[in-house]
Every structure is written in C-alpha cells, then in structure tokens.
Amino acid sequence: DNKGLCETILNLNKNIASVAIINKQGRPIEKISRPEFINPFPDYMSELFCMHCVLQISMGRDFDEQYGPINYHISERPNMTLLTFPLADSVIVVSVSKNIGPISLAKKIAKITSNKEKN
C-alpha cells in the first residue's frame, strides 16, 4: 500500500519533510508531508519537478546491465536534500532538511524499498 510506504519512510526521521510516489508519467500517486515543512510549488512547477525525478531514474536504468541498478540518487541543494529511489514502475521522492546526513538515511530507505519490491 503506497500510503503505508510513504508513512513508514516519513516516520524514519523528523528531518524528512515529505515523501511522494510518482508514476512513470511524472504524476504523483501518493504524497505525504510534515506540516512544518510545507513549501508549496505552483502546479506546473510540481509537474516539471516530478517529471525530472522520473527521467533521472529512468535514464539511469539504461545502464543497469553495465553497472547494476540504481539504489538511490541524492541531489543536495542549499536549503534541502532530495533523495530519489526506483520502485517498480514508479519513483519515490523524499525531501529532507539539511540537518541530517543523507547517505545513511538513503541506505535505510533503499532497504525499505528493496524489501517492498520483494513482497
């Protein structure tokens, strides 16, 4: 269940601002956020942003045979970090405040997503 997966990830750490599952067309199919972190984007910005995240993971899959599958992708910006994870035909996008080391968190989330794909 997508909502349960989003809640599980959000509850891993209080520095996680939001979790979204995006389909391969770049449309969110589930979103959850902490109220204290909400920073609204205009609809067109959210759509472009989601398509960017999907395209990034999708293009990376072109090299799975050569290098192995992507576990996660980290994008650090001045005021937030974005983590993206492949999940079957969708992508999980997690936004995180700058108060946490992204690699250890990304590894925890990747473990959850790989267990989800096995079930």
What are these regions (language model features)?
Residues 1-119:
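Non-catalytic interaction/Regulatory regions outside core domains
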